[in-house]
Amino acid sequence: AKVTEKSWQPQTTSTKRWKKRKTPSQPRSRGKVRKIYKKVKRPLHVCSRKKYSPKVITTSRRQKRARRANKFETIP
């Protein structure tokens, strides 16, 4: 009996799906102050979660500088 070798093909569809799932979409805040969560190391076997809640730090976004008109404009 002949043994036919199947040409090995990588499963591209499943890997593509996995890659898409692995990268989460970043929440984009429009015109709001972003909240950055500081990672707090919690001690083991502690039930009270209120005590060790992640610290929320609000950072003000830098405003883009508006282009100012040149004081000394060249006369055509």
Curated annotation (Swiss-Prot):
Keywords: Chromosome, Developmental protein, Differentiation, DNA-binding, Nucleosome core, Nucleus, Spermatogenesis. One of its GO terms (biological process) is cell differentiation. Transmembrane segments: none annotated. Residues 1-11 have a biased composition (Polar residues). GO terms for cellular component: nucleosome; nucleus. It is found in: Nucleus; Chromosome. Residues 16-34 have a biased composition (Basic residues). Its main location: nucleus. Involved in nuclear basic protein transition: histones are replaced by spermatid specific proteins which are themselves replaced by protamines in late spermatids. This is Spermatid nuclear transition protein 3. Residues 1-34, 56-76 are annotated as: Disordered. GO terms for molecular function: DNA binding.
